[in-house]
């Protein structure tokens, strides 16, 4: 029963979980949350603990390289949301709404098992432990854990286009992720989903095609160049012949 009680932020077990989470973050612990987009057991928003924000939390998405297409608009959009969260910015709740909209298996439903068997899942946690600053020395351990209240079965699918529009027109997001937004708009135009669930999602994401983006860099300093990275989603999804994180 406790497993289902986690679906409400005001349940006894959820409150106790957040209190324990705050204690380990204050002690300087780094946390890694990796979720599978093809998991028929654990929703992505739950696996990624998307309701919480803290600089010591790193998130990543596992994508089975065999089950999924080489390039999938939905996967890349989810990866962009994870990247935005990892950079410490607000994703306008798009990650949670997207994962709630596609809860359950999208292709094979094997992601829940394969996630635990993928060596790079553990490699990422090890790299995050040893290759980033200590939360104690950087001051991250003194930052409070910020949480968003939630309740079971309260997802409103009509919030999705508003959330998407808010993200794409956020001046901070447009400044740092303009290259990625341009890619997303092009990929959406070429997206041809086949299942009813994904076709419904495509219709709700229709505002993507109406967003206007500048063709020239903005006047803000230090805007990332299109030549900065070969893969704009590398921090959120590491490419691998077998799988992607």
Language model region names:
Residues 1-245:
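Lipid deacylating catalytic domains
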């Amino acid at each position: 029963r406790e497993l289902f009680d986690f679906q409400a932020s005001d349940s006894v077990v959820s409150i106790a979980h957040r209190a324990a989470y705050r204690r380990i973050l204050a002690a300087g612990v780094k946390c890694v949350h990796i979720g599978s987009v093809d998991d028929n057991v654990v929703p992505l928003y739950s696996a990624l603990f998307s309701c919480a924000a803290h600089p010591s939390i790193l998130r990543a998405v596992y994508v089975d390289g065999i089950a999924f297409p080489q390039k999938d608009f939905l996967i890349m959009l989810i990866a962009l949301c994870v990247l935005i969260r990892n950079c410490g910015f607000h994703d306008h709740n798009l990650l949670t709404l997207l994962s709630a909209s596609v809860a359950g298996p999208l292709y094979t439903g094997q992601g829940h098992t394969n996630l635990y068997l993928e060596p790079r899942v553990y490699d990422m946690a090890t790299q995050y432990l040893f290759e980033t600053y200590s939360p104690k020395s950087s001051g991250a351990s003194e930052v409070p854990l910020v949480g968003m209240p939630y309740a079971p079965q309260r997802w409103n699918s009509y919030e999705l286009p508003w959330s998407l529009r808010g993200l794409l027109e956020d001046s901070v997001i447009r400044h740092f992720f303009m290259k990625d937004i341009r890619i997303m708009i092009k990929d959406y135009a070429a997206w041809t989903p086949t299942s009813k669930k994904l076709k419904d999602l495509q219709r709700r994401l229709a505002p993507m095609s109406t967003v206007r983006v500048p063709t020239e860099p903005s006047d803000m300093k230090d805007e990332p160049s299109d030549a900065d990275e070969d893969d704009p989603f590398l921090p959120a999804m590491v490419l691998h012949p077998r799988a992607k994180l």
